[in-house]
Amino acid sequence: MYKRKRIVVALGGNALGNTLPEQMIAVKSTAKALCDLIEEGHQVVVVHGNGPQVGMINNAMTALTHEDETQPNTPLSVCVAMSQAYIGYDLQNALREELRKRGFMRTPVVTVVTQVRVDPDDPAFENPSKPIGKFLTKEEAEYQAKAYGHVMKEDAGRGYRRVVASPKPVEIVEQDAINSLVDANKIVICCGGGGIPVTLEGHHLKGASAVIDKDFASCLLAKQLDADMLIILTAVEKVAVNFGKENEKWLDDLTVSQAKKYIKEGQFAAGSMLPKVQACVDFASSGVGRT
């Protein structure tokens, strides 16, 4: 018998393109795939990454500060909030348009500006690992490191990128509001870029200099929503072992035990495919029937 599923879909920031025109094209294609699920009767909650986008925003804000000394530095948490707004804006409108093309004239789509609490003592703050911004050559990376003091690392053989702290999500601050919207059959876009990273100081939520991995945030969200399925979309076709090597092998499916084995072998790059596989293992292991 057909069962309606509650599905959390996580879109990779790299899959959204590197420019605004590219993003407009990408979200239209993504909206069609998401609306296929909605048309089948499933509840869909959308999370998106922001790696390239938050890096570009941060670079622009940094350049402005260097050009005009009266302009203060823009915190990374504020850059994440900016990325939530403009990516959510494009996604929300693309979904709305595609739904109406299919006759869903009264199906509301809403983007929630989402804060996610992290532990200020998370060791990730001492070990930056989350790539943001566009891919650079070695020479470009060396210039950014010297000019702006950024930590730069090679990303899975595809070039160099800036890396920042990526603490694990502890609590989704707006979780109750998200639950209410989903229970009311709204299509919700939330936890953009993993959520705006904040730490709790008394009653005050203070922005943290970090970018939370959207895969871990999606896993936490899916568990809190009691979702049936977590889908993580990427810019590459599939998960692979021996990625980029002569004996590279694409995987059509993967059990939890196999995934744990490959993680132990170091098959997946930190800040890239590793958190995606870890998030899927965590979610699939958290309840019966979860995939």
Residue ranges and their predicted role:
Residues 1-50, 56-66, 180-185:
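N-terminal glycine-/serine-/threonine-rich phosphate-binding loop
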